[in-house]
Amino acid sequence: MGEVPREVFLPPERERQAYNDQALPLTQGQTISQPFMVAIMTEALALEPSHRVLEIGTGSGYQTAVLAELAGQVYSLERIQALASRAEMTLRELAYPNIHIQVGDGSLGWPEEAPFDSILVTAGAPHVPESLKAQLREDGGRLVIPVGDRWVQDLVRVVRRGNEFGSENLLACRFVPLLGEEGWDTPEAP
């Protein structure tokens, strides 16, 4: 994380707060995760330089850059075109050759590029999407995802062994909702 300048991923009016350990607002109701949470989620993936990682929720691109420092290839899905474009521009300026960004429904993953060694979801889901589980590498693929209701979730790590999926709760957390076919229907609570 020390290699990635968090301030360049923030709106200019938030740059002074870049190294505060807190989530900060971006645009369109989205946030950049607090550094502590970025560290916990990244560590839970147990990344290696040869790994192929799928990130759901590009957002500002900060977490994407952290993943790219540790993994061989990073594929990142963002549902909001404006965020994807801004993140792509920032990451290009920082010269990351191993990042691929696409706009789409993150709850469905990126099946054309599967399988992945690790999948990181940066939005809270009502359950673990089956599409994402299916895209994990069969021999130890890891998925880290916030699961719960719209107000509080548990950060869950799922590990795949063949057709079996073990899971463990890591800690309580709160994320913006994962919207999509296998996520929430609307950004607001019912």
Regions found by a protein language model. Give the residues of each.
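Class I SAM-dependent transferase core
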Residues: 2-54, 58, 62-70, 83-100, ...
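Conserved nucleotide-cofactor-binding alpha/beta core module
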Residues: 46-166
